[in-house]
Amino acid sequence: MAQQSQFDADVIIVGGGPAGSTLGNLLGTYGVRTLILEREPDIIDYPRAVGMDDEALRAFQTTGLAEPLLKDMIQNTLLRYHHSNGKMFAEVGPKAKPFGWPRRNLFIQPLSEKVIRSGIARFSHITVLTGHEVETFTQDSEGVTLNVK
């Protein structure tokens, strides 16, 4: 017989990668009881993204994670875009900080993801379960039931 567990949460986030963990931090900041279910047992050790802009840093400012994230970033970097033939077609040079944060920032995703995920540990009302994959869910007037393996 399959093991059954019950969690009382206002929000369930399926996926604890950068987006899900960021949402978890935002919900944690506002006191929302949250369950995060992540299929992978740990943070994936290769990057899938490399850049973060000032708008993203504003969201992380809300969670208190902007400064820790900046420690591992190359800030306010010049970006050059090239065609497949090697010819440059655009150059973006960030000069201003209209929102108070550097505009173009390069990062190593696994490092940033560790900061974001560790931020969740500040909140006793957030539960993160890694190595748990949602197979199906049903919703009725009583709530949501997930089948998780």
Region roles according to the model:
Residues Q3-A19:
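Beta1/beta-strand and adjacent pyrophosphate-binding region of the FAD-binding site
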Residues D10, R33-L35, T127:
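Structural signature of beta-strand start/N-cap positions in the alpha/beta core
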Residues G15-P18, R39, Q109:
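Glycine-rich Rossmann-fold phosphate-binding loop(s) that bind the pyrophosphate
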Residues G28-A49:
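Glycine-rich FAD pyrophosphate-binding loop
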Residues Y30, R122-F123:
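Conserved dinucleotide-binding and phosphotransfer motif residues
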Residues D45-A121, L129, E135-T138:
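Active-site-adjacent segment of FAD-dependent monooxygenases/related oxidoreductases
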Residues T138-K149:
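Conserved beta-strand-loop-beta-strand element in the redox core of flavoprotein oxidoreductases
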